């Protein structure tokens, strides 16, 4: 059963889970996670990071473009599952990868943004904001659905390992795509977009056509 406990945080917050069991699952757009955190912080949202990989560990941080700033640190393997459930349940939003924490977010009913280029969108649950490799660049994607994953190879990228196209399925997912997902789920952000559109209509000759 889902614990019926109040939120541990005051005010609105989002949860992020930027680590996973395979490197191919990571979102490897340089600086992407920090830009998303800054976007949320600047709009009054706390950002809670919940992964078993400890924040501040140089090796793990290097996979995220450096040590993330502006987060509430709830990382580490010492935190039990029920604690994770409570934090996710009361969040306004969850942003994660093709990993177990994303499935947990979906299971408790929290709006979920799932970032994955190495698996096709049909691989996970449907009712989420699913971010996939842009289809405008003829970019490689979906290797998880086309090849057997080698869990012993951290740099597993069956089509482009050791080439400039290594992990391009993930690198080409932009920060703007993730922010669009945030706007989709957070009503006040969507309202701001609509207000800007209306203002443009009023001030521009394009308003005659709307």
Name each model feature, range by range.
Residues 3-7, 58-61, 83-85, 140-144:
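Short, solvent-exposed polar/charged micro-motifs at secondary-structure junctions
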